[in-house]
Amino acid sequence: MTSACEAVPQLGLVCLTVGPEVRFRTVTLSRYRALSPAEREAKLLDLYSSNIKTLRGAADYCAAHDIRLYRLSSSLFPMLDLAGDDTGAAVLTHLAPQLLEAGHAFTDAGVRLLMHPEQFIVLNSDRPEVRESSVRAMSAHARVMDGLGLARTPWNLLLLHGGKGGRGAELAALIPDLPDPVRLRLGLENDERAYSPAELLPICEATGTPLVFDAHHHVVHDKLPDQEDPSVREWVLRARATWQPPEWQVVHLSNGIEGPQDRRHSHLIADFPSAYADVPWIEVEAKGKEEAIAALRLMAPFKKD
Protein backbone atom coordinates (compact mmCIF):
# COMPACT_ATOMS: atom_id res chain seq x y z
CA MET A 1 0.00 0.00 0.00
CA THR A 2 1.28 3.45 -0.91
CA SER A 3 2.24 5.76 1.93
CA ALA A 4 -0.21 8.56 2.70
CA CYS A 5 2.68 10.98 2.24
CA GLU A 6 3.52 9.70 -1.24
CA ALA A 7 0.15 9.15 -2.92
CA VAL A 8 -1.66 11.66 -5.09
CA PRO A 9 -5.02 12.19 -3.33
CA GLN A 10 -8.03 10.32 -4.67
CA LEU A 11 -11.03 12.62 -5.13
CA GLY A 12 -14.45 11.31 -4.14
CA LEU A 13 -17.85 11.87 -5.74
CA VAL A 14 -20.72 12.51 -3.31
CA CYS A 15 -23.90 10.56 -4.13
CA LEU A 16 -25.11 12.22 -7.33
CA THR A 17 -23.92 13.87 -10.52
CA VAL A 18 -24.93 17.33 -11.65
CA GLY A 19 -25.66 15.72 -14.99
CA PRO A 20 -28.30 13.02 -15.51
CA GLU A 21 -25.96 10.05 -15.12
CA VAL A 22 -26.48 9.30 -11.41
CA ARG A 23 -29.90 10.33 -10.11
CA PHE A 24 -31.97 8.31 -7.64
CA ARG A 25 -35.72 8.11 -7.08
CA THR A 26 -37.58 8.45 -3.79
CA VAL A 27 -41.04 8.52 -2.24
CA THR A 28 -42.37 10.74 0.53
CA LEU A 29 -43.58 9.31 3.81
CA SER A 30 -47.05 10.83 3.35
CA ARG A 31 -47.38 9.30 -0.12
CA TYR A 32 -46.17 5.94 1.14
CA ARG A 33 -48.57 5.87 4.08
CA ALA A 34 -51.50 6.55 1.76
CA LEU A 35 -50.86 3.23 -0.01
CA SER A 36 -52.32 -0.16 0.85
CA PRO A 37 -49.91 -2.90 2.03
CA ALA A 38 -49.85 -4.45 -1.44
CA GLU A 39 -49.29 -1.07 -3.06
CA ARG A 40 -46.49 -0.30 -0.62
CA GLU A 41 -44.68 -3.50 -1.56
CA ALA A 42 -45.11 -2.84 -5.28
CA LYS A 43 -43.96 0.75 -4.90
CA LEU A 44 -40.81 -0.15 -2.98
CA LEU A 45 -40.00 -3.04 -5.31
CA ASP A 46 -40.12 -0.69 -8.29
CA LEU A 47 -38.21 2.08 -6.51
CA TYR A 48 -35.52 -0.13 -4.95
CA SER A 49 -34.99 -1.98 -8.24
CA SER A 50 -34.58 1.32 -10.07
CA ASN A 51 -32.14 2.68 -7.51
CA ILE A 52 -30.03 -0.48 -7.54
CA LYS A 53 -29.84 -0.22 -11.32
CA THR A 54 -28.77 3.43 -11.00
CA LEU A 55 -26.22 2.46 -8.36
CA ARG A 56 -24.82 -0.15 -10.71
CA GLY A 57 -24.53 2.60 -13.32
CA ALA A 58 -22.73 4.79 -10.77
CA ALA A 59 -20.03 2.13 -10.55
CA ASP A 60 -19.58 2.28 -14.31
CA TYR A 61 -19.54 6.09 -14.19
CA CYS A 62 -16.86 6.17 -11.51
CA ALA A 63 -14.74 3.63 -13.38
CA ALA A 64 -15.04 5.56 -16.65
CA HIS A 65 -14.03 8.84 -15.00
CA ASP A 66 -11.22 7.42 -12.85
CA ILE A 67 -13.09 8.17 -9.62
CA ARG A 68 -11.94 5.80 -6.89
CA LEU A 69 -14.04 7.07 -3.99
CA TYR A 70 -17.83 7.26 -3.95
CA ARG A 71 -20.26 8.23 -1.21
CA LEU A 72 -23.40 6.15 -1.23
CA SER A 73 -26.64 8.05 -0.88
CA SER A 74 -28.25 7.34 2.48
CA SER A 75 -31.63 7.69 0.72
CA LEU A 76 -31.19 4.75 -1.65
CA PHE A 77 -33.92 2.73 0.04
CA PRO A 78 -36.65 4.94 1.54
CA MET A 79 -38.72 3.43 4.37
CA LEU A 80 -36.12 0.76 5.10
CA ASP A 81 -35.87 1.92 8.72
CA LEU A 82 -39.55 2.78 9.18
CA ALA A 83 -40.64 1.65 12.64
CA GLY A 84 -43.35 -1.02 12.64
CA ASP A 85 -43.16 -1.63 8.88
CA ASP A 86 -40.94 -4.40 7.52
CA THR A 87 -41.96 -3.93 3.88
CA GLY A 88 -38.69 -2.30 2.91
CA ALA A 89 -36.62 -5.00 4.60
CA ALA A 90 -38.58 -7.75 2.84
CA VAL A 91 -38.20 -6.07 -0.54
CA LEU A 92 -34.48 -5.56 -0.05
CA THR A 93 -34.08 -9.22 0.91
CA HIS A 94 -35.83 -10.15 -2.33
CA LEU A 95 -33.40 -7.95 -4.26
CA ALA A 96 -30.30 -9.23 -2.44
CA PRO A 97 -28.65 -10.73 -5.56
CA GLN A 98 -28.98 -7.47 -7.51
CA LEU A 99 -27.67 -5.41 -4.59
CA LEU A 100 -24.65 -7.66 -4.16
CA GLU A 101 -23.92 -7.48 -7.88
CA ALA A 102 -23.91 -3.68 -7.66
CA GLY A 103 -21.45 -3.86 -4.78
CA HIS A 104 -19.20 -6.20 -6.73
CA ALA A 105 -19.21 -3.73 -9.63
CA PHE A 106 -17.67 -1.07 -7.40
CA THR A 107 -15.17 -3.51 -5.91
CA ASP A 108 -14.14 -4.79 -9.34
CA ALA A 109 -13.63 -1.20 -10.51
CA GLY A 110 -11.43 -0.43 -7.49
CA VAL A 111 -13.88 2.12 -6.08
CA ARG A 112 -14.02 2.62 -2.32
CA LEU A 113 -17.53 3.13 -0.90
CA LEU A 114 -18.56 5.22 2.11
CA MET A 115 -21.83 6.47 3.55
CA HIS A 116 -22.68 9.63 5.52
CA PRO A 117 -26.25 9.37 6.90
CA GLU A 118 -28.61 12.26 7.55
CA GLN A 119 -28.01 14.74 10.34
CA PHE A 120 -31.24 13.78 12.11
CA ILE A 121 -29.34 10.74 13.39
CA VAL A 122 -28.26 11.73 16.91
CA LEU A 123 -26.91 8.74 18.80
CA ASN A 124 -26.23 10.78 21.94
CA SER A 125 -29.56 12.60 22.09
CA ASP A 126 -31.01 13.22 25.53
CA ARG A 127 -34.32 11.82 24.20
CA PRO A 128 -34.56 8.00 24.34
CA GLU A 129 -36.85 7.80 21.31
CA VAL A 130 -34.32 9.71 19.19
CA ARG A 131 -31.50 7.45 20.34
CA GLU A 132 -33.59 4.40 19.46
CA SER A 133 -34.55 5.68 16.01
CA SER A 134 -30.94 6.71 15.36
CA VAL A 135 -29.59 3.22 16.08
CA ARG A 136 -32.37 1.75 13.94
CA ALA A 137 -31.45 4.04 11.04
CA MET A 138 -27.75 3.32 11.37
CA SER A 139 -28.45 -0.41 11.46
CA ALA A 140 -30.49 -0.10 8.27
CA HIS A 141 -27.62 1.71 6.55
CA ALA A 142 -25.18 -0.94 7.76
CA ARG A 143 -27.50 -3.61 6.37
CA VAL A 144 -27.28 -1.96 2.95
CA MET A 145 -23.50 -1.94 3.19
CA ASP A 146 -23.52 -5.61 4.19
CA GLY A 147 -25.81 -6.31 1.25
CA LEU A 148 -23.31 -4.66 -1.08
CA GLY A 149 -20.67 -7.05 0.24
CA LEU A 150 -18.66 -4.27 1.89
CA ALA A 151 -16.14 -4.86 4.64
CA ARG A 152 -17.04 -4.14 8.24
CA THR A 153 -14.09 -1.79 8.63
CA PRO A 154 -13.54 1.97 8.22
CA TRP A 155 -12.42 1.24 4.65
CA ASN A 156 -16.16 1.31 4.03
CA LEU A 157 -16.86 4.14 6.44
CA LEU A 158 -20.24 4.86 8.02
CA LEU A 159 -19.80 8.48 9.07
CA LEU A 160 -21.60 10.66 11.60
CA HIS A 161 -21.21 14.07 13.15
CA GLY A 162 -20.79 14.20 16.91
CA GLY A 163 -24.50 14.75 17.46
CA LYS A 164 -25.92 16.73 20.36
CA GLY A 165 -23.48 19.26 21.73
CA GLY A 166 -22.20 18.89 25.27
CA ARG A 167 -22.79 15.14 25.30
CA GLY A 168 -19.40 13.85 24.23
CA ALA A 169 -19.12 11.56 27.24
CA GLU A 170 -22.46 9.98 26.37
CA LEU A 171 -21.31 9.44 22.79
CA ALA A 172 -18.08 7.79 23.92
CA ALA A 173 -20.00 5.54 26.30
CA LEU A 174 -22.49 4.26 23.74
CA ILE A 175 -20.13 3.55 20.81
CA PRO A 176 -18.83 0.23 22.22
CA ASP A 177 -22.41 -1.04 22.52
CA LEU A 178 -23.43 -0.30 18.92
CA PRO A 179 -24.20 -3.32 16.70
CA ASP A 180 -21.02 -4.62 15.06
CA PRO A 181 -22.09 -3.75 11.48
CA VAL A 182 -22.32 -0.11 12.62
CA ARG A 183 -19.51 0.09 15.17
CA LEU A 184 -16.84 -1.52 13.03
CA ARG A 185 -17.43 0.97 10.20
CA LEU A 186 -18.08 4.06 12.31
CA GLY A 187 -16.25 7.35 11.83
CA LEU A 188 -16.85 10.80 13.36
CA GLU A 189 -16.59 14.18 11.65
CA ASN A 190 -16.11 17.61 13.18
CA ASP A 191 -18.84 20.13 12.41
CA GLU A 192 -19.14 23.90 12.36
CA ARG A 193 -21.31 24.19 15.46
CA ALA A 194 -21.38 21.45 18.08
CA TYR A 195 -18.10 19.51 17.88
CA SER A 196 -14.64 20.76 16.96
CA PRO A 197 -11.90 18.25 16.14
CA ALA A 198 -10.42 18.94 19.57
CA GLU A 199 -13.68 17.82 21.18
CA LEU A 200 -14.00 14.70 19.02
CA LEU A 201 -10.40 13.53 19.22
CA PRO A 202 -10.60 12.13 22.79
CA ILE A 203 -13.77 10.24 21.84
CA CYS A 204 -12.11 8.81 18.75
CA GLU A 205 -8.99 7.82 20.67
CA ALA A 206 -10.96 6.20 23.49
CA THR A 207 -13.20 4.16 21.19
CA GLY A 208 -10.87 3.41 18.28
CA THR A 209 -13.07 5.44 15.94
CA PRO A 210 -11.38 7.30 13.06
CA LEU A 211 -11.77 11.07 12.83
CA VAL A 212 -12.75 12.55 9.48
CA PHE A 213 -11.40 16.09 9.44
CA ASP A 214 -13.31 18.83 7.61
CA ALA A 215 -11.19 21.96 7.20
CA HIS A 216 -14.14 24.14 6.14
CA HIS A 217 -16.07 23.21 9.28
CA HIS A 218 -12.95 23.83 11.36
CA VAL A 219 -12.46 27.32 9.89
CA VAL A 220 -16.10 28.26 10.51
CA HIS A 221 -16.20 26.80 14.02
CA ASP A 222 -12.98 28.49 15.16
CA LYS A 223 -13.52 31.67 13.08
CA LEU A 224 -10.17 31.29 11.32
CA PRO A 225 -9.04 33.42 8.35
CA ASP A 226 -9.00 30.56 5.83
CA GLN A 227 -7.99 26.95 5.25
CA GLU A 228 -4.29 27.88 5.14
CA ASP A 229 -4.31 28.45 8.89
CA PRO A 230 -1.49 26.32 10.44
CA SER A 231 -4.01 24.47 12.60
CA VAL A 232 -5.46 22.84 9.48
CA ARG A 233 -2.25 20.90 8.91
CA GLU A 234 -2.06 20.07 12.60
CA TRP A 235 -5.52 18.52 12.48
CA VAL A 236 -4.87 16.64 9.27
CA LEU A 237 -2.00 14.88 11.04
CA ARG A 238 -3.78 14.38 14.36
CA ALA A 239 -6.79 12.95 12.56
CA ARG A 240 -4.52 10.69 10.50
CA ALA A 241 -3.23 9.12 13.71
CA THR A 242 -6.75 7.83 14.45
CA TRP A 243 -6.83 5.83 11.21
CA GLN A 244 -5.56 2.27 11.14
CA PRO A 245 -3.93 2.07 8.72
CA PRO A 246 -3.22 5.80 8.15
CA GLU A 247 -3.42 5.22 4.38
CA TRP A 248 -7.19 4.92 4.79
CA GLN A 249 -7.55 8.51 6.02
CA VAL A 250 -10.50 10.43 4.58
CA VAL A 251 -11.04 14.20 4.79
CA HIS A 252 -13.81 16.43 3.49
CA LEU A 253 -13.19 19.33 1.12
CA SER A 254 -15.45 22.31 0.50
CA ASN A 255 -15.31 26.09 0.11
CA GLY A 256 -17.83 28.70 1.24
CA ILE A 257 -19.80 30.50 -1.47
CA GLU A 258 -18.94 33.99 -0.24
CA GLY A 259 -15.74 33.32 1.66
CA PRO A 260 -14.17 31.06 4.28
CA GLN A 261 -16.83 31.76 6.94
CA ASP A 262 -19.78 30.98 4.66
CA ARG A 263 -21.21 27.59 5.67
CA ARG A 264 -22.84 27.10 2.27
CA HIS A 265 -20.87 24.97 -0.18
CA SER A 266 -19.65 26.56 -3.40
CA HIS A 267 -20.16 25.02 -6.84
CA LEU A 268 -16.44 24.47 -7.46
CA ILE A 269 -13.32 24.37 -5.29
CA ALA A 270 -11.28 27.55 -5.78
CA ASP A 271 -9.12 27.20 -2.67
CA PHE A 272 -7.48 23.83 -2.10
CA PRO A 273 -5.76 23.72 1.31
CA SER A 274 -2.08 22.90 1.02
CA ALA A 275 -2.47 20.81 4.19
CA TYR A 276 -4.46 18.28 2.13
CA ALA A 277 -1.71 17.71 -0.46
CA ASP A 278 -0.73 14.31 0.94
CA VAL A 279 -4.12 13.14 2.18
CA PRO A 280 -4.91 9.85 0.44
CA TRP A 281 -8.70 10.19 0.16
CA ILE A 282 -10.67 13.42 -0.24
CA GLU A 283 -14.46 13.64 -0.50
CA VAL A 284 -15.34 16.68 -2.60
CA GLU A 285 -18.36 18.35 -1.02
CA ALA A 286 -19.00 20.90 -3.74
CA LYS A 287 -22.35 21.60 -5.37
CA GLY A 288 -20.73 21.02 -8.75
CA LYS A 289 -20.07 17.34 -7.98
CA GLU A 290 -18.25 15.82 -10.97
CA GLU A 291 -17.61 19.28 -12.42
CA ALA A 292 -15.74 20.21 -9.24
CA ILE A 293 -13.66 17.04 -9.44
CA ALA A 294 -12.76 17.74 -13.07
CA ALA A 295 -11.73 21.31 -12.20
CA LEU A 296 -9.64 20.15 -9.23
CA ARG A 297 -7.70 17.80 -11.45
CA LEU A 298 -6.31 20.82 -13.25
CA MET A 299 -4.81 22.09 -9.97
CA ALA A 300 -1.78 20.97 -7.97
CA PRO A 301 -1.29 18.34 -6.57
CA PHE A 302 -3.58 16.59 -9.06
CA LYS A 303 -2.41 18.06 -12.36
CA LYS A 304 -0.30 15.66 -14.36
CA ASP A 305 2.74 16.92 -16.20
UniProtKB/Swiss-Prot annotation:
It is an enzyme of class 3 (hydrolase). Component in a DNA repair pathway. Removal of UV LIGHT damaged nucleotides. Recognizes pyrimidine dimers and cleave a phosphodiester bond immediately 5' to the lesion. Its EC number is 3.-.-.-. The gene is uvsE. Keywords: DNA damage, DNA excision, DNA repair, Endonuclease, Hydrolase, Manganese, Nuclease. NCBIfam families: PRK02308.1-4. It comes from the Bacteria. Belongs to the uve1/UvsE family. SUPFAM superfamilies: Xylose isomerase-like (SSF51658). One of its GO terms (molecular function) is endonuclease activity. Transmembrane segments: none annotated. GO terms for biological process: nucleotide-excision repair; pyrimidine dimer repair; response to UV. Its cofactor is Mn(2+). This is UV DNA damage endonuclease. Coiled coil: none annotated.
